[in-house]
């Protein structure tokens, strides 16, 4: 359960980083 939770959280964080990256790229352009 805890492992699954941490894995899910990690995935969400990674997705958030990617979204932030895309957002910053859009702002730069």
UniProtKB/Swiss-Prot annotation:
The keyword Translocase does not apply. Its main location: secreted. GO terms for cellular component: extracellular region. Keywords: Disulfide bond, Secreted, Toxin. One of its GO terms (biological process) is defense response. Contains 8 disulfide bonds. It is found in: Secreted. Expressed by the venom gland. Signal peptide: none annotated. One of its GO terms (molecular function) is toxin activity. Belongs to the CRISP family. Not toxic when administered to crickets at doses up to 5 nmol/g. This is Cysteine-rich venom protein 25-A. It comes from Naja haje haje.
């Amino acid at each position: 359960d805890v492992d699954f939770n941490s894995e899910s959280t990690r995935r969400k964080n990674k997705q958030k980083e990617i979204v932030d990256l895309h957002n910053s790229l859009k702002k730069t352009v």
